[in-house]
Every structure is written in C-alpha cells, then in structure tokens.
C-alpha cells in the first residue's frame, strides 16, 4: 500500500483507482483459467498486490471533496458496500454455480470469476471518465457548487492543520493506533471468516443445493448491513457536536 500511496500523490486518486480496479478485475477474471496450485498462488498474490491502495485511495479522494464534519458519514456509506456485496454476492454465486455450469464449455466456478471480475474493469473505466481529482475540475457542478465545496474543505483544513514532526516511533506510542488496528483487525477477520468458510460450514451442516447455500450466506451480511446503517444514523447525530473521537 505504501508504494501505491506514494504514486497516488503524484498522479492523483482518479488514475490510481483506475489502475487498481482494472488490474484487480483482470486478475480476478483471469482466475477462471487457473488449473494448477502454483497458478492459483501466483494469481492470489497478484490480486493482493493490485488491490493494495484501494481503501487509502478512496479515503484520500474523499478528503478532497468533504470536510471532516461530513467525512464520517460519507466513509460509513462507502464501507456499507462491503456487507451489501456479501448480500448480493451469495445468491449470484449460487445461481452461477447452478445455472451456468457447462454453458459455453465453462464450469460454474469459471463463470463466477468472469461475472464478478468483469464489473471491476468496467467500473474502473467509468471512474476515470466520470470522477475528478479536484472539485474545481468537476464540470457537472455549477460554479456556485464548486465554490461552496472548495470553501468548506479549505475552512476545514485551516481549522485542522496537519501536524508535523511526528515519527514512526511516536505513532507506535499512540494508544489510538492500537485501538483502531484492533477494531479493523476484528472487522476484517469477521468478514473474511464468513466469506471464506460459511459456505463450507453450511454444506457440512447438510445444505446440499448450491443456490440455497448462497441464500443462507447472505443472512450475516444482511445483519451486518443493518448494524452499519444504525451506526450511520448515530454518526449523523454525533457529527454536529463532533463527539466521536476515540
């Protein structure tokens, strides 16, 4: 992620997101042609390499458009996409494995990688043509809207100037770093554990039909989405008073 972030400072978030999403989608789609364990390991490694920098890139992009008072709600809406993808991905995966197996000579799992990898490529191209690195470049905004966004961001930056002189050692001494790290670790561990192992657990529990496994798999993600919506409502309440810091 560090090289990706350094490159993003030079070329901007728009080109960075284009690079990440297109390469990410190409590798994900290419997984459909894997036939050996070594090919699988290489493709998974490349997927991680190309995926790195996506979340920092999105956060950096949003800081150009939203002041701190609104950033919490915007980031929460962005993160809401993860459980929603789980809700949609389970049934889609079950349908692809059941209904597309043998179509065009491809097995169901190959269609699954094709269906889930191609949208990333298309969305990456859309990001490049639709998004702008700076509000001043947004032709789809009126002059008044651009001026308002730029003013709000500048006022926020003036009220919260960046702190200099910090080192890696000082960051390691900050308790908030460990609290946030633990929070993100538990969040990602839950997401990956459910995403990777829940289908196998359901099959071992006696659910045979692949599509039914996909439907059952969406339940925990749906509950997670509801919880994040409730948290989002709390953020809307706390942001006016800015009482949400750790």
Which residue ranges define each predicted feature?
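Short hydrophobic/alpha-helical segments at membrane-entry points of transmembrane helices
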Residues: 36-44, 179-180
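Extracytoplasmic gate region of multi-pass secondary transporters
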Residues: 171-228
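Helix-breaking motifs and short loop linkers at transmembrane-helix boundaries and internal kinks
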Residues: 12, 33-39, 50, 67, ...
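Cytoplasmic helix-loop-helix junction between adjacent transmembrane helices
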Residues: 43-80
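Single conserved hydrophobic/aromatic residue that forms the stacking wall/gate
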Residues: 235-246
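Central mid-sequence intracellular linker of multi-pass
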Residues: 104-167
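Conserved MFS/SLC helix-loop-helix module at the cytosolic interface between two early adjacent transmembrane helices
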Residues: 1-37
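Glycine-rich segments within core transmembrane alpha-helices of 12-TM secondary carriers
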Residues: 75-97, 119-120
